[in-house]
Amino acid sequence: MINIRPDEISSIIREQIEQYDQDVKVDNIGTVLQVGDGIARVYGLDQVMSGELLEFEDKTIGIALNLENDNVGVVLMGNGRQILEGSTVKTTGQIAQIPTGEAFLGRVVNPLGAPIDGKGDIANTETRLLEAMAPGIISRKSVCEPLQTGITSIDAMIPIGRGQRELIIGDRQTGKTAIAVDTIINQKTEDVVCVYVGVGQKASTVAQVVNVLEEKEAMAYTIIVCASANDPATLQYIAPYAGAALAEYFMYNGKATLVIYDDLTKQAMAYRQMSLLLRRPPGREAYPGDVFYLHSRLLERAAKLSDALGGGSMTALPVIETQASDVSAYIPTNVISITDGQIFLSNDLFNSGIRPAINVGISVSRVGSAAQTKAMKQVAGKLKLELAQFAELEAFSQFASDLDEATQKQLARGTRLREVLKQPQNSPLSVAEQVALIYTGINGFLDELEVASVKKYCASLLSFLNTSNNSYIGIVSSTNQFTAEAETALKEAISESKAVFMK
């Protein structure tokens, strides 16, 4: 017979009792009442938070947006085809967040931070809330450093500073994305992390942007967030916030960042679709009442941080598409009032061959001039004046037949200045090169050239400055000032290159 040892049994029982864990896990579970059009109505989630992530039986994730008396309105982040009426939903206790980190550089991700470029998983170090609070007044510093776009007409007349929000607005096919991509390419030597957010774009358009950035070796410091036209409205709605969260990680680590939202019109449309399906009351143009807050809370996250917080910055370039150049529509006026200035692209200028098609007359930068480099300030003031007078005279000269010599000279110079400001796509210029071209134009060095050969001469002048042992580029690049020494060197370069060009 086996010996039973009571002391051993009692010690085992005591050990089991000591290890007994009395923690009770309570899941808040609800039932799907109806589902369709990317929206689910759920009954029974009494403890749910506004904006909380919910998990359905088929692992689809949704966001609780409408908390009503008897049900919860949930927007789905997937197609929801496997969700059935009566299936269960449980709360996750989490608010929407996205993984962030250095490993995201050079990658294409969806608004949830999952890679969609086929290059494997991304090792993330931390997560950030999609809807983070914008920095307060004490956390900020006034805009004081320039962000060079490499586009002469912008850097000279509508300068952008680090931490600024500058709207790019225009009709479809007027070169809005081209300006944004050029700006990214120009940050190659500037140590700026760029985030391009494609909202509601064709996947082929985003692929084209990726190809251009790879060709120009700009993907190394760029993250692309893509919610294409065939993605659910929920993903299109959160994509800009995801881009801002990715940029914030670098901003709070003391880096300069640039975020491009291309474009916020499509985000507003996605939000309108969600709101109408959730039966929220429509307002002007059927947009919900809080569509202003949709964009203001996003764009307020762009800032130049104080030195105490590391001095990082986030510059935002939101893009808005207008219909028939109607800037007074609801979304354009909203975003114009939120941002620190706008670059207006005109269809007529684009079609008449002036590219980038920037309408300088109605484009403004409200804070960027404080951050403009001294070299550019020295030549840009006169350029603005010349172009403003030229625009006025050009309109007048269409009616007047006999013009005096001074007026004809001014018109001729204005036409040549306009040629100087034309620039091919994906070929941004350095500050020194821009200053050289503007100086050449405003001081009459191009007056004796034919209008048709101005662009050709500008190209030859730049190649001369970059290849000869002329000291101009070195002086301006190192001092950021257009000194008397630099002016002398530039005048020499102009006369030498012109002599070769005129042969």
UniProtKB/Swiss-Prot annotation:
One of its GO terms (cellular component) is chloroplast thylakoid membrane. One of its GO terms (molecular function) is ADP binding. Keywords: ATP synthesis, ATP-binding, CF(1), Chloroplast, Hydrogen ion transport, Ion transport, Membrane, Nucleotide-binding, Plastid, Thylakoid, Translocase, Transport. It catalyses: ATP + H2O + 4 H(+)(in) = ADP + phosphate + 5 H(+)(out). It comes from the Eukaryota. Its EC number is 7.1.2.2. F-type ATPases have 2 components, CF(1) - the catalytic core - and CF(0) - the membrane proton channel. CF(1) has five subunits: alpha(3), beta(3), gamma(1), delta(1), epsilon(1). CF(0) has four main subunits: a, b, b' and c. Belongs to the ATPase alpha/beta chains family. This is ATP synthase subunit alpha, chloroplastic. The gene is atpA.
